[in-house]
């Protein structure tokens, strides 16, 4: 089929990614002519974008029209949730979300922030805990509390060189919820699809 469906990262990179996607769309059309191309705002990153790509493929495989794919995937994106725990607070300190003093104190106390994304893709702190094990348990509690229609959902977990933690989070969640399917993927450094 002569059509493409894509989008960059969430709101943090929205303008740059959107402009790059629009430029790519324009260049493609200049070279190959008019095609159906739609740019999604994934409001996610990493495994969230992987899930979106899987949903697009599922829609394509089922024979949906271009507009049906767009509508279905937009609805799918709106129902996605992203959660994560930070190993250290350097990123929050460097981007100004946490002062240097607070980062030092939190690090000394082994405080791990539990983070998530709002529906519009904005990252926010959902809670915190002392130690990684407690933080992961708190994250799992947030996931379970926020989850709607679990039997329709795919639980996708990404990790960066920490498969044991990913498996533990998967175990904690699958003991309490019944999802359509579940998988774990490894990422490396800054990760997008």
Question: Model-flagged regions — what are they?
Answer:
Residues 2-13:
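Single conserved hydrophobic/aromatic residue that forms the stacking wall/gate
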Residues 7-8, 38-40:
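Hydrophobic/aromatic beta-strand patches that form the interior of the parallel beta-sheet core
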Residues 17-27, 32-38, 44-54, 58-192:
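Mixed-charge interfacial surface used for oligomerization/domain docking
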């Amino acid at each position: 089929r002569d059509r493409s469906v894509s989008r960059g990262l969430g709101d943090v990179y929205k303008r740059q990614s959107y402009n790059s996607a629009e430029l790519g769309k324009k260049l493609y059309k200049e070279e190959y002519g008019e095609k159906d191309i739609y740019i999604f705002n994934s409001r996610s990153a990493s495994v969230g974008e992987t899930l979106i790509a899987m949903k697009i493929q599922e829609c394509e495989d089922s024979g949906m029209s271009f507009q049906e794919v767009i509508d279905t995937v937009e609805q799918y994106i709106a129902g996605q949730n992203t959660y994560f725990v930070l190993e250290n607070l350097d990123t929050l300190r460097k981007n100004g979300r946490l002062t240097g003093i607070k980062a030092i104190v939190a690090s000394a106390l082994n405080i791990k922030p539990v983070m998530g994304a709002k529906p519009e893709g904005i990252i926010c702190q959902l809670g915190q805990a002392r130690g990684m094990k407690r933080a992961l348990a708190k994250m799992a509690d947030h996931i379970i509390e926020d989850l709607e229609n679990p039997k329709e959902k795919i639980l996708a977990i990404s990790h960066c060189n920490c498969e044991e933690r990913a498996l533990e989070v998967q175990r904690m969640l699958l003991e309490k919820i019944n999802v359509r399917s579940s998988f774990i993927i490894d990422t490396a450094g800054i990760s997008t699809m």
